[in-house]
Swiss-Prot record:
Residues 548-559 have a biased composition (Basic residues). One of its GO terms (molecular function) is serine-type endopeptidase activity. Belongs to the peptidase S39B family. Residues 513-605 are annotated as: Disordered. This is Putative serine protease. It is a multi-pass membrane protein. It is found in: Host membrane. InterPro entries: Peptidase_S1_PA (IPR009003), Peptidase_S1_PA_chymotrypsin (IPR043504), Peptidase_S39B_luteovirus (IPR000382). GO terms for biological process: proteolysis; viral process.
Length: 657
């Protein structure tokens, strides 16, 4: 009995000694947690710190001695772990402290951003660490003691608890690694710590630790994280290698567009079109100013306020042109700017906007162009930069619209505003469209293009006509006030839902055709009514229903004649033409209200009948499997053969090919 009592006393004494030895570690951990809380409270002294793979931004005015104090809790904890003779704990601690340190970095970067999951990770890991530290050493001691006393079964529950805690930490580590893999790709790889002073000069503080090449990294990560999945909103994106540089000179034509409360919603530029000053910006920027619009320009931010403006043109490619009163440019001190064609790929362009209240610029390269009047560009943008003109050699070559992915900023070409009086068919978009204007084009699955892609040519053609009327002296615009403008908010104006660029050809088996959007102010109720009426015939597969399918493209001569005319008659015809998934050039001209589309043309050949029937069948399918497509092909062939019996086997075989 006395033997067991003596053993119990020894065990209690050893537990007390171990607990006493661990007390300083608890204090160190509590001190580290309190220092983390103090950093959270003091947002002006936030620190982005890490080990060898991460970077550190030092607040302005921080010297080398005070920089060491930031790392003191981390160094003390690391020293304590190194003194322990536990290899597993050392390795696990080094990995965990790196993760916590990086989480602290992320939390400071995400200051003010709704990203609650990331903000909670440091607190969860600290709590888990404290539990592991409190349980690991007593459990290890009890396991060793129980193995000597043959009482291992008594401490088995403590082992299970320790294993569960360690597995929990490992689970958090794996989850966090996945998160940081995403964020790490968005950050710049630095080499040394830099302290930013006044102007654009930088002073080295601590060499070979980490670096920061821009003081706006917080804003960059903020915008990039916003671009990770807010569907339905206009997004911006920072571009690799394109930094924000503060400017002291205001470019020609540029204006900042503000709402009635003074908040910047986008940028734009003033330009003379057809002898009048016009404001050009993105359409989604203009619709934010229904209750009033303010224009500001210059480093000193001269401002003019308008209760309302006349919307001259709203295109289907997110562009908007408004009339401004005479003398607006002079009041703002804005100099005249010239519009030029979009340059070729790899040419350097610039964009301008505000970053944390400072007027900045960013440079990038022109990327691939699109047949949808668009092109990629590598200039970094922030929220509030939509509609900003894209400059090259002090000339506007496009307007920034939005991002089409994390590393894809999208601009709209203004080629249609350049040289309109010289020729109607000189730009590359017209030439691209003419290549597709082949009558009775055979359709053989699998298609190399989708009907959605073909519909976008139709939208661009209508947009081209609208742009042409701006340069016409005889055109009379029925301008709509900005406050009463009925914007089409039901769907994006001309952007793919899929993460592909507009010029990418998508298979018809992956994407179903969508309808066009109105050029002028669209009435939602009428648009929904017409869309439903236009889609009703697709439920049937009769020959009469085939008349409601898409009309084939006219030949090149007819297309040119239809696009060159621009006058009051064409304008009234364009305004009376409804927006439906079935483009029809034969809509009535005289009726002001929106009317249903015409039934289309009767097929004139076997190929045309086969094409119309096949498109109708594919468009009415819920899912397009290979079996359904084969049945649709057979039914379309039977339908075409019934209307046009083959007279010669040769012509029939050619048609089938």
């Amino acid at each position: 009995m006395s033997k067991y009592l003596a053993t119990s006393v020894r065990l209690c004494l050893m537990v007390c000694i171990v607990g006493w030895l661990l007390m300083p570690s608890y204090k160190e951990l509590d001190g580290w947690c309190s220092s983390l809380s103090s950093l959270e409270r003091d947002k002006s002294n936030w620190l982005l710190t890490g080990l060898s793979t991460w970077f550190c931004i030092v607040p302005s005015g921080t010297d080398q001695s005070s920089l060491v104090s930031y790392f003191s809790p981390l160094e003390k904890l690391s020293k304590f772990v190194q003194d322990l003779d536990l290899d597993f704990v050392k390795l696990w601690w080094l990995e965990t402290i790196t993760l916590i340190n990086t989480l602290n970095t992320t939390e400071k970067l995400l200051s003010g951003v709704t990203f609650s999951v990331v903000l909670w990770y440091p607190r969860i890991l600290v709590t888990v660490l404290m539990l592991v530290w409190k349980l690991w050493f007593p459990v290890r001691f009890l396991v060793v003691a129980s193995s000597l006393l043959c009482l291992r079964i008594l401490v088995w529950p403590f082992e299970v608890i320790a294993d569960v805690i360690l597995e929990t930490c490992a689970w958090f580590t794996r989850k966090y690694h996945k998160l940081m893999d995403v964020i790490e790709d968005l950050m710049m790889i630095p080499q040394r710590v830099m302290e930013w002073c006044s102007g654009n000069t930088a002073k080295m503080v601590v060499p070979t630790v980490a670096s920061c090449v821009s003081e706006s990294i917080e804003s960059k990560l903020d915008r990039i994280l916003m671009a990770l999945g807010r569907k339905g909103t206009v997004l911006e994106a920072a571009q690799p290698g394109s930094d924000f540089v503060e400017c002291e000179q205001w470019p020609n034509g540029l204006v900042a567009i503000r709402r009635h409360d003074g908040r910047i919603v986008g940028m734009g530029f003033l330009v003379v079109l057809n002898g009048k000053w016009r404001l050009v910006t993105a359409a989604h920027v203009a619709r934010e100013c229904k209750r009033g619009i303010m224009l500001s320009a210059g480093i000193d931010s001269k401002t003019v306020t308008f209760q309302d403006l006349d919307v001259v043109l709203q295109t289907q490619v997110d562009a908007c042109i408004m009339n401004v009163p005479a003398g607006t440019a002079a009041s703002l001190g804005v100099r005249k700017v010239v519009i030029n064609r979009t340059p070729s790929e790899s040419k350097v362009v610039r964009t301008y906007g505000y970053n944390s209240g400072k007027f900045c610029m960013s440079e990038g390269l022109v990327g691939t162009t699109s047949a949808n009047m668009g092109f990629r560009h590598g200039c970094s943008t922030l929220r509030g930069w939509s509609g900003t003109p894209i400059y090259r050699d002090n000339k506007v070559v496009g307007i920034h619209s939005r991002c089409n992915g994390i590393y894809e900023n999208f601009g709209l070409s203004l080629d249609l505003l350049v040289g309109r009086l010289e020729s109607e068919e000189t730009d590359r978009y017209a030439r691209t469209m003419e290549e597709f204007n082949t009558e009775d084009r055979p359709v053989t699955p699998p298609m190399e293009f989708s009907w959605e892609f073909e519909e976008k040519f139709e939208r661009v053609r209508s947009t081209r006509k609208s742009f042409a009327r701006i340069e016409s002296e005889v055109a009379t615009f029925t301008a709509t006030k900005l406050s009463g403008f009925d914007w089409t908010d039901d769907a994006p104006m001309d952007f793919d839902e899929l993460p592909v660029f507009e010029s990418t050809m998508v298979s018809v088996f992956q994407e179903r055709p969508l309808g066009g959007l109105p050029i002028s102010n669209g009435n939602k109720a009428e648009e929904k009514k017409i869309t439903s009426e236009a889609l009703e015939p697709s439920k049937s597969s009769t020959p009469e229903a085939a008349k409601h399918t898409r009309r084939r493209r006219r030949n090149k001569k007819k297309s040119k004649n239809s696009e060159t005319g621009h006058g009051p008659e064409e304008q009234s015809q364009q305004q009376s033409r409804p927006s439906s998934p079935i483009p029809d050039d034969s809509a009535p001209v005289s009726s002001p209200p929106v009317s249903p589309p015409s039934t289309g043309s009767v097929p004139k050949s076997w190929t045309q009948a086969y094409t119309q029937k096949l498109v109708l069948l594919l468009g009415s399918m819920d899912g397009q499997s290979k079996e359904k497509v084969d049945l649709a092909i057979l039914e379309a062939k039977s339908f075409a053969s019934a209307l046009f019996p083959p007279s010669k086997p040769k012509s029939s075989e050619e048609s089938e090919k």
